[in-house]
Amino acid sequence: MKKTALYPCHEQSGAKIIDFGGYLMPVQYAGIIAEHKAVRSAAGLFDVSHMGNFFVKGSRALEFLQFVTTNDLAKVVDGQAQYNLMLYPSGGIVDDLIIYRMSADTFFLIVNASNADKDFAWLQQHIDQFEGVTLEDHTERLSLIALQGPLALSILNRLFPSIDGEALGSFHFCSASFNGFDVIIARTGYTGEKGVEMCVPNEAAIALWEALMAAGAADGIQPIGLGARDTLRLEMGYSLYGHEINQDTNPLEARLKWVVKMDKGHFIGKEACEQAMQHPQRTVIGFSLEGRALPRQGFTLYNSDRQAIGVVCSGTLSPTLQEPVGTCSVLREYGKPGTPILVEVRGAFHAGIIRSLPFVTNTSLA
């Protein structure tokens, strides 16, 4: 089992450790609800170093990435990042990822931990068509730290006085120096709150983590585990691979049509997307339940006649709303907000309604 460079920090903080994506990762520290509320009200620090990260380099790097992804990277400038998708020819999703343009011939990719090996192999499979383009896996060399919450940018400024996080702008990044090491600081996140995600060499990771915790101590910063990371992203309706998106889900079903630019050149899966637009079958949408029954992935959704209409993708008790919420994949005719549904939980039917996403709208990013 792998450990991130920050594993000693998690042990010292008394975190509960689990296996996630082949890494020993903290699922919680003080508790999922307390950590969730800390991020919504103040700030939290996340170790996301298990995420895969690759460099794509070469004079045809942009051309290569345009071919294997759906969004239009030609519109991205140096210092800017873009949310993107890789598709199979069938239109199913290989993975979702963020691509950072370092320069005209250098791009930095962050992919899901559970998909890192698969993604690297997928990219390697297609790279030979683009002479001179190289693919480098830096996952074992770099640590990724996310600082998120309404107070995150002011905490960042205490440690890096020359960086104005507000001025940097969403999905933009810059470079800074910490203890003689280069740090990439990006205005990205997975919580719905203001914040940054930082990439630093493993050698400097513990010192940076401790410095950020010290800088935010007066504001109540807390270390945050994967449990609260999941409840935070679910309240926002953000997709998680293996739940809302997978190899059998196309971007249109997953509410990710905005990431697919049909007016750019050819890309893998383009024809399948064109067909899916003509004959949409399902949609991923939110829902909530009455009572306290918790919906879990794989549970069946029914209409009022108890006919199966879909399946739960993700579910939890929302710490902010204090009610059971989730995402589901349903037949499109049942995907309108306000539609009554039933969810079978442990053999009993529980009433609910289809809800629009996000569930929580009054965040610091809103």
From Swiss-Prot:
EC numbers, comma separated: 2.1.2.10
Domain of life where this protein originates: Bacteria
Reactions catalysed according to its record: N(6)-[(R)-S(8)-aminomethyldihydrolipoyl]-L-lysyl-[protein] + (6S)-5,6,7,8-tetrahydrofolate = N(6)-[(R)-dihydrolipoyl]-L-lysyl-[protein] + (6R)-5,10-methylene-5,6,7,8-tetrahydrofolate + NH4(+)
GO CC terms, sorted: glycine cleavage complex
Record-stated family: Belongs to the GcvT family.
Function (record text): The glycine cleavage system catalyzes the degradation of glycine.
GO biological process: glycine decarboxylation via glycine cleavage system
Entry-linked NCBIfam families: gcvT, PRK00389.1
The protein's assembly and partners: The glycine cleavage system is composed of four proteins: P, T, L and H.
Keywords of this entry: Aminotransferase, Transferase
Taxonomic lineage from the root: Bacteria, Pseudomonadati, Chlorobiota, Chlorobiia, Chlorobiales
Alphabetized GO MF terms: aminomethyltransferase activity; transaminase activity
Gene3D superfamilies named among the record's database cross-references: Aminomethyltransferase beta-barrel domains, Aminomethyltransferase fragment, Probable tRNA modification gtpase trme, domain 1
Record protein name field: Aminomethyltransferase
InterPro entries: GCS_T, GCS_T_bac, GCST_C, GCV_T_N, GcvT/YgfZ/DmdA, GcvT/YgfZ_C, TrmE/GcvT_dom1
